[in-house]
Amino acid sequence: MTMQYDVKSAHNTVSGVAVNYRARLKGVLISPSTAVTYNTSFCNNVSLSGTYDVPGSTTCTVTIANHGLSNGDRVYLNFTSGTAQDEAYTVANVATNTFTVTVASATTSGNVTMYADILAEFDCSNGTSFYTLIPGEGILAPNGIYVGIPNVAITTTLFYG
């Protein structure tokens, strides 16, 4: 194996597509501006859309046709309307077109976009920036890289090739 010289970077201040073509995630720099517990997700850029409902509890029911999930799977949910928190969740109570996740207590509903192929998740609970090098050739993202940043003051720089 020879050295790869064509490593590039992408900087994100909000959730979104960082790379829109096949790439390998090589490393990540996460820079929080405040000490708060959060999870940042890097996903293969393939999504499914649907709806969600949180009826005044901590149970969020997500409806996405033929989602293909199993109990215990981790998914990144981008709630595109309503007030639910965008982040990675563990799936439960799976049926063909629905599943549930546990959220902060709320009464809200709306639209959601799901990324079911999480390449890497990073947790942090202080205001210190940190870098993570992905070993070997990196993690393959066949359809590009979507970055899921929580609703806090944080930026990411990812390195890919």
List PLM regions with ranges:
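Short edge beta-strand/loop segments characteristic of extracellular beta-sandwich folds
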Residues: G27-S31, A65
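Small/polar beta-strand repeat architecture
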Residues: V46-D117
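Exposed aromatic-hydrophobic patches
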Residues: T63, F130-G138
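Short, surface-exposed beta-strand/strand-loop-strand elements in extracellular ectodomains
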Residues: A35-S47, A116-F122, T156-G161
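C-terminal interaction-tip segments
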Residues: M1-A23, S33, I149-G161
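Short proline/glycine- and polar residue-rich coil/turn motifs
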Residues: N93-A95, D123-F130
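Short beta-strand/loop motifs in extracellular/secreted proteins, especially
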Residues: K26, V36-T40, N71-V75, I154-T156
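Noncatalytic modules at the cell exterior or secretory-pathway interfaces
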Residues: K26-V28, G138-V152
